Amino acid sequence: MRTILFVSLVGLAALGCSKSESKKSEGSSMVEEKVPEVTVDQVDTALAASEWQAVDANGDATRKKMGVLPGAVLLTDSETFSASELPADKSKGLVFYCANTHCGASHEAASKALTAGYKNVKVMPEGIAGWVKAGKKVQTI
């Protein structure tokens, strides 16, 4: 009887853990749905046509090491930047990027821009590393 009770409790605990994991996954996918992702080539084309403004969410060390997209707005900090650092026109297309696909700073900053009322916000998940790998021009700092 104790064995059955123990197995039942372990099963319930495992079920509870799987549900909380599923909620976490749903929450993170909601962020991804709010902030569309774009490719390096899409960004290159849109920047050339002046359709979007690039926004760099990297720290100074990454900027000095890898450079920045030409003409990018350089945020003071991806988590604590002021909306006044972004273009005044909240309908202007903004594309946020950070170091690479393992960096979450661009998503954090893009979410903050959405909260501040910007309507056309995107993220380039490949970041500056993907930009450089694709042979695109960078501005050195």
Task: Report residues per predicted region.
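Rhodanese-like catalytic fold shared by cysteine-dependent sulfurtransferases
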Residues: R2, F6, L15-V40, A61-F96, ...
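A short acidic-Thr-Gly-centered motif at the start of a beta-strand
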Residues: D41-S50
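Structural scaffold elements adjacent to functional motifs in cytosolic proteins
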Residues: A54-D56
